[in-house]
């Protein structure tokens, strides 16, 4: 099967979040299964700086962005049997960053038009065109309304994945003529209109053959007003084409037996190295070295979405327990201040690292006993899967991908891979932590069983990609 991904970012070239991870991993896994896979993304200045000497110039052409006649350079690089095509235009993409400019609408309108015209020019007409988030959300609409005259495009099936429903691409309707070069009929009849704006994401939901998001629970949640960010009505209307597929993690890179960032390696069969990592981290961060004290790890952006309001409300309470806690991350200033204050007040219990450090992050996953992640909402979440891979049991709020990936401890049969609570409040976070501490302190065999079960879970992309493969096959 020929599959083309179009996205605004992709690891290792340009990455700001989870979308970049998916584009770096899913095409590679599909290629391993024998599919012919290509990725189209912008050629940013940071791509040129890091990979410019490896990337070949393929061709160039011009495209019309409304009245503008714009240059489209095409560059190419093959990696892991996936061909990456880069759209090169320094005016649009040499900004020192991926997103956040006043003209993002124009930048990504240009990118979508260039990507669609590129397919014919490189003679790669995919069976499935898989687009991601609002930056590429007009492609399914353009495929059917603007480029339908290209006969080769008529059998292409479009899949749209929502990674972040908060950013929907809402613009003035004049953009249809001014940038995309199409009439306003579909806006005037209400198809593309939402809240009196042109809504790119709504267009993708209506015009795609399938819509996916990054976990089954989140797919259900975005059909509700609480999580749908204003698009819940459209999600309910189009529920028949909506499904959720949990993202994977790179299990080759994230491997406690080989991770280069760890001073000691370990496996689910031999956790001796995990204890040594704990002692090493305690020494490194100036905490008292004690292999028996439960160590709670947090690696996260410090925001309300990640549940830091309820963590902050209970932090004094938590630090009365016989625990140690290590926090790594940056975010809202008041949370940074709160954790720094409590770290100075309880220097033997709390280490607050208000920065981001990949090496330290891996060491926290490997050293901690409990990984705290009580997100208010979480479309998928990768940290809880990484924690389980390293034998750190997640303590999570049952929402989105957290609900789908963490099995709550069952005290009757010992099953589970972590601890969870349903009602989003500091009280239930604290009660769940007390349960986890009780199991850790009083039932060591039950704890070891939970660690074994967590480390046995397969969250690899090779497994996650099977669900995408089945989805694509349903469209043929």
Curated annotation (Swiss-Prot):
It holds the Pfam family Glyco_transf_5. NCBIfam families: glgA (TIGR02095), PRK00654.1-1 (NF001898). ADP-alpha-D-glucose binds at residue 15. SUPFAM superfamilies: UDP-Glycosyltransferase/glycogen phosphorylase. One of its GO terms (molecular function) is alpha-1,4-glucan glucosyltransferase (ADP-glucose donor) activity. Belongs to the glycosyltransferase 1 family. Bacterial/plant glycogen synthase subfamily. Synthesizes alpha-1,4-glucan chains using ADP-glucose. It comes from Streptococcus agalactiae serotype V (strain ATCC BAA-611 / 2603 V/R). It comes from the Bacteria. This is Glycogen synthase. GO terms for biological process: glycogen biosynthetic process. InterPro entries: Glyco_trans_1, GS/SS, Starch_synth_cat_dom. Pathway: Glycan biosynthesis; glycogen biosynthesis. It catalyses: [(1->4)-alpha-D-glucosyl](n) + ADP-alpha-D-glucose = [(1->4)-alpha-D-glucosyl](n+1) + ADP + H(+). Its EC number is 2.4.1.21. It is an enzyme of class 2 (transferase). Keywords: Glycogen biosynthesis, Glycosyltransferase, Transferase.
């Amino acid at each position: 099967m020929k599959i083309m991904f179009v996205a605004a970012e992709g690891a290792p070239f340009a990455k700001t979040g989870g979308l970049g991870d998916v584009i770096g991993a899913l095409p590679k896994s599909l290629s391993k299964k024998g599919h012919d896979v290509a990725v189209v993304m912008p050629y940013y200045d940071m791509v040129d700086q890091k990979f410019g000497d490896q990337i070949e110039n393929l061709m160039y052409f011009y495209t019309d962005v409304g009245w503008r006649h714009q240059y489209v350079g095409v560059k190419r690089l093959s990696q892991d049997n996936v061909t990456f095509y880069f759209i090169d235009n320094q005016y649009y993409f040499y900004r020192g960053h991926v997103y956040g400019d006043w003209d993002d609408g124009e930048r990504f309108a240009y990118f979508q038009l260039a990507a669609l015209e590129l397919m014919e020019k490189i003679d790669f007409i995919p069976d499935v065109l898989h687009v991601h988030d609002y930056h590429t959300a007009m492609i399914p609409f353009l495929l059917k309304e603007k480029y339908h005259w290209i006969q080769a495009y008529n059998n292409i099936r479009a899949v749209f994945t929502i990674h972040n429903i908060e950013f929907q691409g809402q613009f003035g309707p004049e953009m249809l003529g001014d940038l995309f070069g199409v009439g306003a009929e579909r806006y005037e009849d209400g198809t593309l209109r939402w809240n009196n704006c042109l809504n790119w994401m709504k267009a993708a939901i209506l015009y795609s053959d399938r819509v996916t998001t990054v976990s089954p629970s989140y797919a259900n949640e975005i059909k509700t007003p609480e999580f749908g960010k204003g698009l819940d009505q459209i999600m309910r209307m189009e529920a028949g084409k909506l499904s959720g597929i949990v993202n994977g993690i790179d299990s080759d890179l994230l491997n406690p037996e080989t991770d280069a960032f760890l001073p000691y390696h370990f496996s689910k069969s031999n956790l001796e190295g995990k204890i040594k990592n704990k002692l090493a981290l305690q020494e490194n961060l100036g905490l008292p070295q004690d292999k028996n004290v439960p160590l709670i790890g947090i690696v996260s952006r410090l925001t309300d979405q990640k549940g830091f309001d309820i963590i902050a409300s209970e932090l004094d309470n938590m630090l009365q327990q016989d625990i140690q806690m290590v926090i790594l991350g940056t975010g809202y200033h008041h949370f940074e201040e709160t954790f720094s204050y409590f770290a100075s007040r309880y220097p033997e219990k709390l280490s607050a690292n208000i920065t981001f450090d990949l090496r330290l992050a891996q060491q926290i996953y490997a050293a901690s006993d409990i990984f705290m992640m009580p997100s208010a909402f979480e479309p998928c979440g990768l940290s809880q899967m990484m924690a389980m891979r390293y034998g750190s049991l997640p303590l999570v709020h049952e929402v989105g991908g957290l609900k789908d990936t963490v099995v709550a401890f069952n005290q009757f049969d010992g099953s589970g891979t972590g601890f969870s609570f349903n009602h989003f409040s500091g009280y239930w976070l604290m009660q769940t932590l007390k349960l986890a501490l009780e199991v850790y302190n009083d039932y060591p065999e039950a704890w070891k069983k939970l660690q074994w079960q967590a480390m046995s879970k397969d969250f690899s992309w090779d497994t996650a990609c099977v669900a995408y493969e089945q989805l694509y096959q349903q469209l043929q």
